[in-house]
């Protein structure tokens, strides 16, 4: 647990590497025809899970002095995927592992075995792979075959990314979304990273929102990269942007890409719409001014931003709305319920209507104990809520932050905040 007071952070902080970008770059490097070096200033439990799993699939992966050296190796007779609690690792690597190994053991921890893998498993079964059971831990048998893949687009975009990353190993493949593709920016991040490593993906976008297709041509192969830079992470930069908006004290985040395709870059517009100023100086972004206008956000394309936006909403007088959050029920926790409970526990007012959430902010919370339900993004939200709390906030399961941002509390204190283990 951690206890967080309302001491205000301000100043300049370096961005941490984008987890979504790092996962994809590491996988491309492990599948390449030559070694790669990837610049990664920090790691996390989720990134470690991907590196461990790539080792289990035959790659030689060494992380030293903020550089990952990836040397592709022959796939073992039996592969081993160890995603721990990382849904991204699991979903991206299931088809990748099946594209290079005849047999693969797959483990999982925490809530991960209960997170959805359909319709991807069904498509893999239709293309040559069998599973000992329908949720991990399980063993996959049979090599994934290329061809036509079709899936709904409203469960997880990671299914599309995983099949795209596997495609160069299995020949000509087309992956089609039979319903509108949600979190499509993450698929764009996948195709851009694949292009960086030498594989061009053909993207066909019809006039309607369905039958969006991605094709990887026959003969495509990944090539290694030297000193490949992982860009700054927007989902974690959002913590600092929201902190600035809640307190009115400026915070600058260095090493960010204004033109990133990361879905959570949308937090910039959220801050502007809430009345803050967002200014750029090269790759540094600064947020100034206290947020004053209620938030009205569609969660379909940025579901991971709900927890920190909920904290921001608590600091703004009036009703903020967060709609279309169905997929948040399938995260590390049921995030709609968990966020609502956290707001209530700390003295805020919130209303749930189906998959929508409405927060009636007053600018002040009482504080007290909040349950982060072993969800790293709830830890971020609870820490932010302490900024407007009358008494300290005690966060249960605060160690969950190591999933994505192990040094978070150290950085928080570095900028003048006060978070202490209890």
What are these regions (language model features)?
Residues 1-422:
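Short, structured segments at the rim of ligand-binding sites
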């Amino acid at each position: 647990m951690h206890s967080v007071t309302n001491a205000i952070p301000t100043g300049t902080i370096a961005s941490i590497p984008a987890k979504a970008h790092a996962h994809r770059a590491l996988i491309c490097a492990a599948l390449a025809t030559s070694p790669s070096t990837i610049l990664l200033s920090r790691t996390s439990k989720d990134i470690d899970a991907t590196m461990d799993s790539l080792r289990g699939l035959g790659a030689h992966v060494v992380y030293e002095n903020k550089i990952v050296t990836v040397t592709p190796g022959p796939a073992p007779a039996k592969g081993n995927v160890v995603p721990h609690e990382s849904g991204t690792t699991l979903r991206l690597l299931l088809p990748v592992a099946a594209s290079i190994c005849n047999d693969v053991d797959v483990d999982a921890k925490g809530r991960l075995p209960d997170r959805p893998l359909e319709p991807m498993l069904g498509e893999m079964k239709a293309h040559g792979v069998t599973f000992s059971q329908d949720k991990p831990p399980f063993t996959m048998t049979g090599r994934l075959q290329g061809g036509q893949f079709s899936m709904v687009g409203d469960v997880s975009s990671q299914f599309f990314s995983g099949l795209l990353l596997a495609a160069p190993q299995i020949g000509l493949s087309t992956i089609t979304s039979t319903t509108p593709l949600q979190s499509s920016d993450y698929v764009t991040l996948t195709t851009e990273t694949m292009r960086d490593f030498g594989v061009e993906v053909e993207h066909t976008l019809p006039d309607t929102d369905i039958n969006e297709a991605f094709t990887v041509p026959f003969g495509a192969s990944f090539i290694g990269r030297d000193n490949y830079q992982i860009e700054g992470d927007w989902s974690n930069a959002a913590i600092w942007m929201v902190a600035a908006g809640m307190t009115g004290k400026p915070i600058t985040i260095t090493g960010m890409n204004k033109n990133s395709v990361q879905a959570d870059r949308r937090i910039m517009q959220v801050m502007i719409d809430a009345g803050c100023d967002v200014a750029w100086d090269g790759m540094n972004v600064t947020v100034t001014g206290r947020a004053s206008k209620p938030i009205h956000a569609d969660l379909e394309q940025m579901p991971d931003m709900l927890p920190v936006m909920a904290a921001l909403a608590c600091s703004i007088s009036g009703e903020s709305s967060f709609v279309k959050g169905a997929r948040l029920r399938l995260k590390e926790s049921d995030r709609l319920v968990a966020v609502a409970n956290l707001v209530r526990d700390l003295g805020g007012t919130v209303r749930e209507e189906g998959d929508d959430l409405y927060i009636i902010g007053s600018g002040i919370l009482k504080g007290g104990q909040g349950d982060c339900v072993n969800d790293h993004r709830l830890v971020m939200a609870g820490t932010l809520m302490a900024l407007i709390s009358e008494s300290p906030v005690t966060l249960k399961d605060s160690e969950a932050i190591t999933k994505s941002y192990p040094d978070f509390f150290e950085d928080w204190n570095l900028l003048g905040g006060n978070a202490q283990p209890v």
